[in-house]
Amino acid sequence: NTYLGFQSSIYVNSTWYNQTCNQSHYVHRLHRDYDDFKFLGITIYWNDVKEQNAPLGFVKKSHTNPNIVEPVSILTGSAGTVLITDTFALHKGYPALKERYTSSIRFGKLFNAATVINGFLKS
């Protein structure tokens, strides 16, 4: 927990299947995730992810410097690739021209904007 600076918990644990959308014009805009003031994500690619498999686009070092907005690095990898990310950094998704299987785990405070509604944990 050195990066986060506090004792963290897993607050998201999910598996994703992105099926083919055949819309090459579909791209998410660059954005930041605002789950909490500090959090860390791990993504595992379960199949080879190339530019056609909805890779993650990421602007390196933009989590600590808000003036950095480019270039966007496309994070491809072979099956078993593990990405460790701080998605407060600018990032975006690309279209799934071929299917993609991933798992996502997020570490942070258990009680944060992604897990709490009106003071109660989301179920």
Task: Enumerate the predicted regions with their spans.
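A short, structural micro-pattern
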Residues: 9-10, 36-38, 97-99
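Signature of the catalytic double-stranded beta-helix
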Residues: 1-15, 30-31
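A structural signal for short, well-ordered beta-strand segments
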Residues: 13-15, 42-44, 103-107
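Non-heme Fe(II)/2-oxoglutarate
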Residues: 82, 89-123
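Phosphate/oxyanion-binding loops and surfaces in catalytic or ligand/nucleic-acid-binding neighborhoods
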Residues: 2, 6, 49, 110
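Short, well-ordered beta-to-alpha junction loops that form the rim of enzyme active sites
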Residues: 13-15, 61, 87-89
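Catalytic core of non-heme Fe(II) oxygenases with the double-stranded beta-helix
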Residues: 21-76, 82, 112-121
